[in-house]
Amino acid sequence: MNSKCETIKPQVVNSILDYWNLLKPKIMYLVVLTGITGMIIAPGSIHPFIAIISTLCIALGSGAAGAINMWYDSDIDALMTRTKNRPIPAGKISKSSAIELGLVLSVISVTVMMISVNYISGILLAISIGFYSFAYTMYLKRRTPQNIVIGGIAGAIPPIIGWTSVTSSISIESLILFLIIFMWTPPHFWALSLLNYQEYEKAKIPMLPVTHGIFVTKVHILVYSIVLFIITLLPGLFLKDYLLYEICAIPLGITFLFHAFKVFTSSNYYKYKAMFTYSVAYLFILFICIILASF
């Protein structure tokens, strides 16, 4: 009996971890942070319970979109080394279970957000889930090299959701946070595509290096990085401690530009990887700086 229980427990734990990975937790962490940032810097107050509900709905919505994405992309995930060990291509979760979970979490997160927080936040969450799941995953990703540019709209909405959870309205401040994420997304994913462009080509995904070449991709990374740097200076105009923010944001942005320039002037795998790795840490730290500078 004990040996049977000991066998069952690891299986249960592994199954839970597989479903957790289906929700793309690394993306979820960043989405939740940006949503919380929108809540914190918004004028006015929000009941702690409502803030928790809003945060959970944003997390569930992100997970729902991740599950639907993995369901639809399981065929191409199986072709790429980077993604072949994901739950569905690895045979750990069935496609039907994945889509069922994604749809259930979508309905729950949007419904609870509408009822418990407000309608505009629920509508924005529905748009974010729908845009990522349908516009990006099912249409843009396999049809245009601008897939991550347009698809980046979905990932840039959460700070607006956080803001509207408090104010029930959209303002210029929340749109600036939206723009930061929107401009960050292309250089982040283009760095990844430089690392894996042969696999994208094999899977017939029209990423920019596949359709327009490596040099054009490098130019795009540099241009978007410059525009991103300029936009990241704007939150200092409305944050309480603008000096603290700029002291954080400017060095972060210069380092981002440094990595982008290194990518532009080099064909070194490790330069591409350094750009991709730094871009993840960059956005986390930048939004933490925004939070700290709001007090």
UniProtKB/Swiss-Prot annotation:
Q: Which reaction does it catalyse?
A: heme b + (2E,6E)-farnesyl diphosphate + H2O = Fe(II)-heme o + diphosphate
Q: How does it sit in the membrane?
A: Multi-pass membrane protein
**Record's superkingdom?**
Bacteria
Report keywords, A-Z: Cell inner membrane, Cell membrane, Heme biosynthesis, Membrane, Transferase, Transmembrane, Transmembrane helix
One GO term under biological process is: heme O biosynthetic process
Pathway where it operates: Porphyrin-containing compound metabolism; heme O biosynthesis; heme O from protoheme: step 1/1
This protein's name: Protoheme IX farnesyltransferase
Q: Which organism is it from?
A: Ehrlichia canis (strain Jake)
Lineage of this protein's species? Answer: Bacteria, Pseudomonadati, Pseudomonadota, Alphaproteobacteria, Rickettsiales
